[in-house]
Amino acid sequence: MWANFADFLGMTADHRDELGAHVSAAGGVQHAPARAHEIGSVVLQLFTKQPSRWAEPKIDDDTTRAFQAERERYDVAVAGAHDSYLINLSSPDRRLWRMSQRSFEAELRRCARLSLDFLVTHPGNATDGDYEAGLERNARGVTESLEAVEGPTGVLLELTAGSGTSVGATFENLQIIIEGIGEGQRHRVGVCFDTCHAYSAGYDLVEDYDSVWAAFDEIIGMDRLGLIHMNDSKHAFDSRKDRHETIGEGTLGTEPFRRIVLDERLARVPKVLETPKGDEGVAADRANLALLRGFRSG
């Protein structure tokens, strides 16, 4: 076991600023590092395909070389991907589950080809209401995919907001999935903590910040924390609704984000914005990153 999952992601003492954003891969993934640089970041998250389609594009040699060259040029310390919105590894529908597993494996294969550090995945939905079976199916799908694809990419299970029949909205759910991963692959699995999802799922980062992280450490372990999605929320605490908002303009306010940025336990954990860009485009990311960095100067 690594001292901290961030070690697995490649964070080093040379990169103290661990703040970044989800950036566009329009025109090809090789353009993402320049877009991260444009907002002043050495941490990025991207999609390796259209997230609302089943089509699985190949990453050719030229694209791989171009991405690696641009990543080196812009000194990107941590680069990862988020998987497709269509994937549901908790589905009781056998056909959909197999489609999801194959798609997830293809996602992981593209990530490995690009030497990405992480692949974030939502645990999915147990649409029949059998959550225990859904968690088992999810673990099986992740295990099969990791067994099929060797490489540097770790899988990060994202905490969900708990809407509908979704699984993964509790720390216990995520730990059950982790424990269900085959022992030979479990070291490649960690957790992505989304602030909006956590608050919507009933983890009160506003009024009970310390207790939230104490529970995370007790149930999952801080050594499994690989990424934090830094998102404010449009909805109330424990609403079970997933709508991201600009930092400080939602129901979380700025204080939880200030505490996260200054929390020494989280200092080396990459943190990625998924906040609305609106008409401002990259300027919105710059503004959010400036706000977060400003907490360090008082």
Predicted regions and their residues:
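Conserved, mostly hydrophobic/aromatic
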Residues: 36, 82, 100, 111, ...
